[in-house]
């Protein structure tokens, strides 16, 4: 049953695989800290309004981080341009921010990621089940899932269950 759920979550986001966790919070902490272990010298670029679970995952990773101004694509580009193109980079941001409800410029961030050879990690916990033709979130609603490398979600809000996941 668990594998079936993971397969359904991967399909929901148009990704190859998904991995479930006990909560969305744990999904962010575990995924970000584990991902960094696979990418030596990685730089994490994090939106200044990211959720506490993302901040915790970044701290646990002990990776170098750079914080960009909230939804400020120009500031993000300045930070990316200052890095060697071959340095591993992960842009971590949310689709819908919990504190004020605004949405991120996903298309623009994904375009910068491609231009500067960075991975994208999009937290969709406040969007899954609410947006998109199948409830896949803002990236699905805007037709942008292919431009996102890792999507993080939760079952504990709109889906009315418990658990969190990543899909990649």
Which residues fall in each region the model found?
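Active-site PLP attachment segment
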Residues: 134, 140-168
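Active-site nucleophile and cofactor-binding loops and adjacent substrate-binding regions
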Residues: 19-25, 48, 152-155
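Active-site phosphate-binding strand-loop segment of PLP-dependent enzymes
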Residues: 66, 70-122
């Amino acid at each position: 049953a668990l594998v079936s759920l993971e397969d359904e979550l991967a399909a929901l986001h148009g990704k190859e695989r998904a991995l479930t966790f006990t909560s969305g919070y744990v999904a962010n902490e575990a995924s970000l800290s584990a991902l960094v272990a696979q990418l030596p010298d990685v730089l994490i670029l994090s939106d200044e309004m990211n959720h506490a679970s993302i901040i915790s995952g970044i701290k646990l990773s002990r990776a170098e981080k750079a914080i960009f101004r909230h939804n400020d694509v120009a500031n993000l580009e300045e930070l990316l341009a200052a890095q060697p193109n071959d340095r591993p980079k992960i842009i971590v941001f949310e689709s819908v921010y919990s504190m004020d409800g605004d949405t991120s410029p996903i298309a623009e961030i994904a375009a910068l990621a491609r231009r500067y050879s960075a991975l994208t990690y999009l937290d969709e916990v406040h969007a899954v089940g609410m947006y998109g033709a199948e409830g896949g979130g803002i990236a699905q609603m805007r037709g942008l899932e292919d431009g996102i490398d890792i999507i993080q979600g939760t079952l504990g809000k709109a889906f009315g269950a418990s658990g969190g996941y990543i899909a990649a």
